[in-house]
Design a protein with these regions (language model features):
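Short beta->alpha transition motifs characteristic of CBS
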Residues: 41, 52-56
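Vicinal oxygen chelate
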Residues: 2-45
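Glycine-rich acetyl-CoA-binding "A-motif" of GNAT/NAT acetyltransferases
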Residues: 49
Length: 56
């Protein structure tokens, strides 16, 4: 799995939404996950799993 670090939660939301709009599949809704972590998971059209996240 590839993890992409974003500078803020707004960009995490935007990237996750864009990935789904472009044909990706949701693998985990965007939101807080434990202390200091905000992220979401998706698979690209080729099936690769990615995470976009930021530290909060």
């Amino acid at each position: 799995m590839v993890a992409l670090l974003a500078p803020n939660p707004d960009l995490v939301d935007q990237v996750h939404l864009l990935a789904l709009t472009l044909g990706g599949q949701n693998e985990g809704d965007v939101g807080p996950r434990g202390e200091g972590f905000y992220g979401g998971y998706f698979r690209d059209p080729d099936g690769n799993k990615l995470c976009v996240y930021c530290r909060t």
